[in-house]
């Protein structure tokens, strides 16, 4: 049986520096995720760090995106090999790794997604990702079709951005603006000049190493500015934010 994930088109688009517009999925529901998948976004983040997701909620969302052109990207709760292994086995190929501060942490993330000898991923011969053992070339194709995006969101991460971006197997650098703002002493104010300067610096250093950069920017003016600065993969909103804003606007229309 053929696996319709290989080759990984999202990974190829990033390597070609093609702009990829995405959206955040935080409602942890297959219906809302399916709606996002019909909208035409290039990629969707299914959030395992701040949203109430786990293996049991991720699988229905992956099923809901089966016919979608939007590439599912999972943000893992932490850079931990067993967690990453389990998410690989259920069918994720694109990973966003939060709070990466050093080259060694970036290398660990890459190794966690690769079978030996390139990495340390544990081997199961039958799981959802290989269609329960029916994809003949899964082991041969898997290592080279995994996308690793590492998230820089601390001063140490900024300081080590060159080493992180140069790490073999890292496909892109993603900025976490809220945590970065907090780390720089500007909690709740990612628009502060110090934070914006750091974001642009990260983009520039990623580009210097031939790596695409990305960010979450639910405000249109911010998203367009980051694209002008050279960001390649930008998430321009979230299902939770869209839902909250639209419902509030509807209520206000009739209640005020």
UniProtKB/Swiss-Prot annotation:
Active site location: 50
Pathway per the UniProt entry: Carbohydrate acid metabolism; galactarate degradation; D-glycerate from galactarate: step 2/3
Gene3D superfamilies according to UniProt: Phosphoenolpyruvate-binding domains
Cofactor(s) listed: Mg(2+)
Keywords: Lyase, Magnesium, Metal-binding
InterPro entries registered for this protein in UniProt: Aldolase/citrate-lyase_domain (IPR005000), GarL (IPR017648), HpcH-HpaI_aldolase (IPR050251), Pyrv/PenolPyrv_kinase-like_dom (IPR015813), Pyrv_kinase-like_dom_sf (IPR040442)
Sites where the protein binds substrate: 151, 178-179
Binding-site positions, Mg(2+): 153, 179
UniProt-recorded Gene Ontology molecular function terms: 2-dehydro-3-deoxyglucarate aldolase activity; magnesium ion binding
CC cofactor note: Binds 1 Mg(2+) ion per subunit.
Positions bearing the site annotation: Increases basicity of active site His: 89
Leading EC class: lyase
Alphabetical GO biological process terms: D-glucarate catabolic process; galactarate catabolic process
Pfam families for this protein: HpcH_HpaI
Keyword Magnesium set for record: yes
GO terms for cellular component: cytoplasm
Record's catalysed reaction(s): 5-dehydro-4-deoxy-D-glucarate = 2-hydroxy-3-oxopropanoate + pyruvate; 2-dehydro-3-deoxy-D-glucarate = 2-hydroxy-3-oxopropanoate + pyruvate
Site (Transition state stabilizer) residue list: 75
EC number, as in UniProt: 4.1.2.20
Subunit composition and interactions: Homohexamer; trimer of dimers.
Purpose: Catalyzes the reversible retro-aldol cleavage of both 5-keto-4-deoxy-D-glucarate and 2-keto-3-deoxy-D-glucarate to pyruvate and tartronic semialdehyde.
Family of the protein in this entry: Belongs to the HpcH/HpaI aldolase family. KDGluc aldolase subfamily.
Protein name: 5-keto-4-deoxy-D-glucarate aldolase
């Amino acid at each position: 049986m053929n696996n319709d994930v290989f080759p990984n088109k999202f990974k190829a688009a990033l390597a070609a520096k093609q702009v990829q517009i995405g959206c955040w999925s935080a409602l942890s529901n297959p219906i809302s995720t399916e709606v996002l998948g019909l909208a035409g976004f290039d990629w969707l983040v299914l959030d395992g760090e701040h949203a109430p997701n786990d293996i049991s909620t991720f699988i229905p969302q992956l099923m809901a995106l089966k016919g979608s052109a939007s590439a599912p990207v999972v943000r893992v709760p932490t850079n931990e090999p067993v967690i990453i292994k389990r998410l690989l086995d259920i069918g994720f190929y694109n990973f966003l790794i939060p709070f990466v501060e050093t080259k060694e942490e970036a290398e660990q993330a890459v190794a966690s997604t690769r079978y030996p000898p390139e990495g340390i991923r544990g081997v199961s011969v039958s799981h959802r990702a290989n269609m329960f053992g029916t994809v003949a070339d899964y082991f041969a194709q898997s290592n080279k079709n995994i996308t690793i995006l590492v998230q820089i969101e601390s001063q140490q991460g900024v300081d080590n951005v060159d080493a992180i971006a140069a790490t073999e197997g890292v496909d892109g650098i993603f900025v976490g603006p809220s945590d970065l703002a907090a780390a720089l002493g500007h909690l709740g104010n990612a628009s502060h000049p110090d934070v914006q300067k750091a974001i642009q610096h990260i983009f520039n250093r990623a580009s210097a190493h031939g790596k695409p950069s990305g960010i979450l920017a639910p405000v249109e003016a911010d998203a367009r500015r980051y694209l002008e600065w050279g960001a390649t993969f930008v998430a321009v909103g979230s299902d939770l934010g869209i839902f909250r804003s639209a419902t509030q606007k509807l209520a206000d229309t009739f209640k005020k």
